[in-house]
Design a protein with these regions (language model features):
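Two-metal-ion RNase H-like nuclease active-site motif
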Residues: 97, 107-116
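RNase H-like two-metal-ion nuclease catalytic core shared by retroviral integrases
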Residues: 84-86, 172-174, 180-184, 194-216, ...
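Short, flexible loop/turn motifs enriched in small residues
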Residues: 118-124
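Hydrophobic "anchor" residues
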Residues: 133-136
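Active-site beta-loop-alpha junctions of metal-dependent nucleic acid enzymes
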Residues: 121, 140-163
Length: 282
């Protein structure tokens, strides 16, 4: 090898190493800002313009190899188990949305409760999410699971409506909080129709459970948090990032807040074998 070729090769290798250090920094900064569990496809989609601006040319496959080489791939997480107390005497409503999909924002809301561990014991997070845009419309964190927890989350969601005159279905499991007449009456007084799961099928409330999982695994809510005040601050930050900064495959790598205001996408079901489900007609 000639001296000229040697130095050219050395310069190329040096540039590659510098580019890799730049990309490592970009990936870490993006994950710190948006979510520590952001995967490779989303990273490449969100950072490709930054790479171009930095003079870095890298396709998706090579980017995956780069992530693997630098131990930046996200390990797969195990499924978690949810429990619902449906052993009560309250009225249980029919499932109005089974095997149907929404075609606009504020046509279908899904609600669920998850727990957040703190050093002082469990806290509970009630969420109301728009099924079409995936935007979290309302939430409430507290140290109890009483009906008021879910009522406060629903009240926030109603306050945050962008299309208040549209007909809306509220879908949840059959937990006593959602079946409580205080909750159902409040929903119905605000023009909301109740719908509930019929049995434990993960697809019957898949969106709500997926949101729970995302918040816990991507934004640090899975770990034991010092106290309720810190848990609330972390939840507020997580919801903001989830709604405004995090891209979603089901939204064609757009963000929930954007889709909620600019609803021009076709809904994608989480059911892999049922991609052409009929649309809701409410």
């Amino acid at each position: 090898m000639s001296k000229q070729a040697f130095y050219k090769r050395l310069t190329t290798q040096q540039k590659k190493e510098i580019d890799h250090q730049k990309m490592i920094k970009m990936v870490k900064e993006y994950r710190k800002k948006v979510g520590s569990k952001t995967g490779g496809i989303k990273l490449h989609n969100e950072l490709k313009q930054d790479f171009i601006d930095a003079g870095i040319k890298i396709g998706r496959d090579k980017f995956y190899s780069f992530l693997r080489l630098n131990k930046l791939l996200i390990p797969k997480t195990k499924n978690y188990i949810t429990t619902t107390n449906s052993n009560h005497m309250y009225k249980k409503y029919k499932n109005l949305v089974k095997d149907k999909v929404p075609n606009r924002p504020e046509q279908l809301w899904v609600s669920d409760i998850t727990y957040i561990k703190t050093e002082n014991g469990h806290n509970y997070l009630a969420l109301v999410t728009d099924a079409y845009s995936k935007q979290i419309m309302g939430y409430k964190l507290d140290n109890h699971m009483r009906t008021s927890l879910c009522l406060d989350a629903l009240a926030m969601a109603i306050k945050n409506r962008k299309y208040p005159n549209r007909k809306l279905i509220h879908h949840s499991d059959r937990g006593f909080q959602y079946c409580n007449p205080k909750y159902t009456t409040f929903a119905q007084e605000n023009g909301i129709t109740m719908s509930m799961t019929e049995q434990y099928d993960p697809y019957e409330n898949a969106i709500a459970e997926r949101v729970n999982r995302t918040l816990k695994y991507e934004y640090g809510l899975k770990k034991t948090i010092k106290n309720t005040d810190l848990a609330l601050k972390m939840t507020q930050q997580a919801v903001y990032i989830y709604n405004n900064l995090r891209t979603h495959f089901s939204l064609n790598l757009r963000k929930p807040a954007d889709v909620h205001l600019n609803p021009n996408i076709k809904y994608k079901s989480y059911r892999k074998n049922n991609v052409n489900l009929p649309e809701l007609t409410i």
